[in-house]
Amino acid sequence: MASSAKSAEMPTISKTVNPTPDPHQEYLDPRITIALFEIGSHSPSSWGSLPFLKNSSHQVTEQQTAQKFNNLLKEIKDILKNMAGFEEKITEAKELFEETNITEDVSAHKENIRGLDKINEMLSTNLPVSLAPEKEDNEKKQEMILETNITEDVSAHKENIRGLDKINEMLSTNLPVSLAPEKEDNEKKQQMIMENQNSENTAQVFARDLVNRLEEKKVLNETQQSQEKAKNRLNVQEETMKIRNNMEQLLQEAEHWSKQHTELSKLIKSYQKSQKDISETLGNNGVGFQTQPNNEVSAKHELEEQVKKLSHDTYSLQLMAALLENECQILQQRVEILKELHHQKQGTLQEKPIQINYKQDKKNQKPSEAKKVEMYKQNKQAMKGTFWKKDRSCRSLDVCLNKKACNTQFNIHVARKALRGKMRSASSLR
């Protein structure tokens, strides 16, 4: 009866103990394995304490049971070896997956940083070089236009004076006596000419005053623009330096995490090797099976703690990656705003030659003083429009800075919450 019961137990044990490649499957209860080892450790010599049976059938059954126990022990050893092999495969797969994810994230962030550095260098080098010759050309054109207008007015008045002088000479030579009243008329005309000359001189003085005022306003505008550009450049440079420092710190932290990951992987591998050596020595000697389950439990706890640490590190790296993505988006917005400013400046420079040509056409038609005043007012309004556009662009930059500050505060809040949750879970496990 005992032999039949033990033979019935054999297939049930082999069915339940065979492991599957599922990494989430639960292992055997260590109490069962300890009981089996205790049963197998008893030698047949201990059975001598039982009363001696004379029948040969009892001796045959005892030999069969001993053989079955030996077979059970062999199967248990094979099962333990298979379990160790599956644990090694699971740990290797986890290590490969984590290493590939970390390296891909670090390489992608490095490429983004390099692209942004190149864009900043291109903008800082191309903007001042492209705008300097256009300013010089516009100043030269305005000076030439003013000089041509003044010379044309002076030449026209000189021609009128010469014509009147010739008429006076002809009259004085041909009709000195008979045309006394005409002399009086000529004197009146000369007086009118003198008055015209005086009015021309006043017009020239007024034109010079306008030119001087325009030049002073140009100088003031240029100084203001240069100061604003210098301030913007300093702000951009400071922000880029801060971003670079943050990026370098994050890269250093990523390298530190990768080093810790490699050290942990080395420790796990060394532990697995030591476990293999222990299992081999125990398999060869067949002694000391009781201490192995306790060691396995402690090793499992250590591995679980290490896996939790690695998951915490990966979560922190993901948060850092989110922060980097937010900063990259802010930099892209900055670049777009700078491009818009550059396009606006180009548009104003294209509008200025059109206004200059319009002024030339009006001056060819000999404009009056009232028209000159109107042109001066129009130039004032145009300059006010350009300053309004610049103020608007500066406000957009301030909005970007506020968005950046809000994003950083939100990310810091999320990171603190995550760290508190991890610390609480770790303390509860301890």
From Swiss-Prot:
Region (Helix-loop-helix motif) residue spans: 166-177
Q: InterPro entries, per this entry?
A: Spz1 (IPR042961)
Question: Which residue ranges does the record annotate as region Basic motif?
Answer: 178-244
**Which residue spans adopt a coiled-coil conformation according to this UniProt entry?**
62-102, 214-269, 316-351
Reproduce the UniProt comment on modification after translation. Answer: Phosphorylated by MAPK1/ERK2 and MAPK3/ERK1.
Phosphoserine PTM sites in chain numbering: S107, S258
Segments carrying the region annotation (Leucine-zipper) are 303-324
Tissues in which the UniProt entry reports expression: Specifically and strongly expressed in the testis. Expressed in several tumor cell lines.
- For the region Disordered, what residue ranges are annotated? 1-25
Q: Which domain of life is it from?
A: Eukaryota
Alphabetically, the GO molecular function entries are: DNA binding; DNA-binding transcription factor activity
Query: Quick one: where is this thing mainly located?
Result: cytoplasm
Q: Which UniProt keywords apply?
A: Coiled coil, Cytoplasm, DNA-binding, Nucleus, Phosphoprotein, Transcription, Transcription regulation
One GO cellular component term of this record is: nucleus
Please tell me whether the keyword Cell cycle is annotated for this protein: no
Q: Where found in the cell? A: Cytoplasm; Nucleus
**More about this protein:** The helix-loop-helix and basic motifs form a SPZ1 specific bHLH different from the classical one.
Self-association or partners: how does it assemble?
Answer: Interacts with PPP1CC isoform gamma-2.
The free-text function statement in the UniProt record for this protein reads: Transcription factor that binds to the DNA sequence 5'-CANNTG-3'(E box) and the G-box motif. May play an important role in the regulation of cell proliferation and differentiation during spermatogenesis.
Name of the protein described by the UniProt record: Spermatogenic leucine zipper protein 1
